[in-house]
Amino acid sequence: MAAPAATDQAWEAVIGLETHVQLGTNSKIFTAASTAFGDDPNTHIDPVVCGLPGTLPVLNQKVLEYAVKAAMALNLNIAEHSKFDRKQYFYPDLPKNYQISQYDEPIAEDGWIEVEVAEKGKDTYLKTIGIERLHMEEDAGKLVHAGSDRLAGSTHSLVDYNRAGVALAEIVSKPDLRTGREAAEYASEIRRIMRYLGVSDGNMQEGSLRCDVNISVRRGPEAPFGTKVEIKNMNSFSAIQKACEYEIQRQIKAYEAGEPIVQETRLWDESKQLTKSMRSKEGASDYRYFPDPDLGPIEVSADQRDSWRAELPELPAAKRHRYADTLGLSQYDARVLTDEKPMADYFEAVVVAGADAKLAANWITGDIAAYVNSNRLSYANLPFRPEQLAEMVQLIDGGKISGKIAKEILPELLENGGSPKAIVDERGLGMISDPAAIEAIVDELLGAHPDEVEAFRGGKTKLQGFFVGQLMKKTGGKADPKLANQILSKKLKG
């Protein structure tokens, strides 16, 4: 395609994502073969997976349930009737030489999600991204190339059909994304939603979630779309962002140099941080779709839809809004707490047990999250139970212990659990909040540091911090800091 006509308009990227989500069923989409990951090659295959003559596929009903729930969470319209089609292409990882997918009658269409975008150097903003469709299909096998990471240049290739026939939900966004960051945040939100639903683990390293990016550039928002390029081989959200950013600049430079953009599929090379040409891009006509004669129409009744909708959990975006609007949390804390459902569940249990939401959020997103992540633990199995953290937060909030004391006992609580109050009482760690006791210690300190007292009264008021530090040292951090500051201020001023 020729370069767009030069105008005063800045270049704008137009990005859409095709997200392939492996549905977390125990058996494959059309057969009882296992979906277990990481086992020896070609151990989870059977005549249906291999496409042997005389075999017939049977739709796994759990796949249909998961696909419909995913579609509902993405605000898609569920089709009462849909069908499966055969997508014809010849490649070693496809044992039947066709893939069972959905072409013109998918299970769901026309939805949207809200994405929170944190662009570097800019304010966080919300953006609604349209979703074209969600359809079910089977995954292909996996090729391992010897001597190269690609077919070209390899000495030979091995094929593992364990993945062939695993259920996929393909989610196709509308071309509403404009930056690499938006694309990465959109993909991240899709994974977050799938994990909340429990329909997929979304593990990108294991291929449970894979994204293909379609990207073009144009002169301004009113200009027609440019030539679309597909990018594959991105195994992280940061790779999605970097691949988009690189490709946007590559296309702009090509147009400005008068070079055409070719409709093609390109691979993201993580080591070189660039995209490189893989093959020309096929169109729908190249696949010669036709209805699969071995599979009947798919029907989803109103009762089924109502039943499955009732089982949906509160989703991440709704949680973020509730945490900010009802609990008064910052956007940042709401985002961090809702990133993983187990963390959100833990936080909510702490609040239900009586803790102040903001204080609980500070502890969970800080010290507790660091401990869980560094030790690769789950919140469900953390020895420090939500009600115990709530007890500790209440001790701090009620002035019974200081934050310093809480930090001192926290490692033991994280490792073994137990009652924070019992530990505080047993070790005499409670806050000193008796004014007379604190006043006596202050008098002692002022008497021991006459030069500093004179300097303070001479205008060096920052020395109050020195006395606070000495007081905390003397009391082992147990003095009520607010009361201590009040008494110190009064005494220092004479």
UniProtKB/Swiss-Prot annotation:
Its EC number is 6.3.5.-. InterPro entries: Asn/Gln-tRNA_amidoTrfase_suB/E (IPR017959), Asn/Gln-tRNA_Trfase_suB/E_cat (IPR006075), Asn/Gln_amidotransferase (IPR018027), Asn/Gln_tRNA_amidoTrase-B-like (IPR003789), GatB (IPR004413), GatB_C_1 (IPR042114), GatB_Yqey_C_2 (IPR023168), Gln-tRNA_amidoTrfase_suB_CS (IPR017958). Keywords: ATP-binding, Ligase, Nucleotide-binding, Protein biosynthesis. One of its GO terms (molecular function) is ATP binding. The keyword ATP-binding applies. It comes from the Bacteria. The keyword Ribonucleoprotein does not apply. It catalyses: L-glutamyl-tRNA(Gln) + L-glutamine + ATP + H2O = L-glutaminyl-tRNA(Gln) + L-glutamate + ADP + phosphate + H(+); L-aspartyl-tRNA(Asn) + L-glutamine + ATP + H2O = L-asparaginyl-tRNA(Asn) + L-glutamate + ADP + phosphate + 2 H(+). One of its GO terms (biological process) is translation. Allows the formation of correctly charged Asn-tRNA(Asn) or Gln-tRNA(Gln) through the transamidation of misacylated Asp-tRNA(Asn) or Glu-tRNA(Gln) in organisms which lack either or both of asparaginyl-tRNA or glutaminyl-tRNA synthetases. The reaction takes place in the presence of glutamine and ATP through an activated phospho-Asp-tRNA(Asn) or phospho-Glu-tRNA(Gln). PANTHER family: GLUTAMYL-TRNA GLN AMIDOTRANSFERASE SUBUNIT B MITOCHONDRIAL AND PROKARYOTIC PET112-RELATED (PTHR11659), GLUTAMYL-TRNA(GLN) AMIDOTRANSFERASE SUBUNIT B, MITOCHONDRIAL (PTHR11659:SF0). Belongs to the GatB/GatE family. GatB subfamily. Heterotrimer of A, B and C subunits. This is Aspartyl/glutamyl-tRNA(Asn/Gln) amidotransferase subunit B. It comes from Synechococcus sp. (strain WH7803). The gene is gatB.
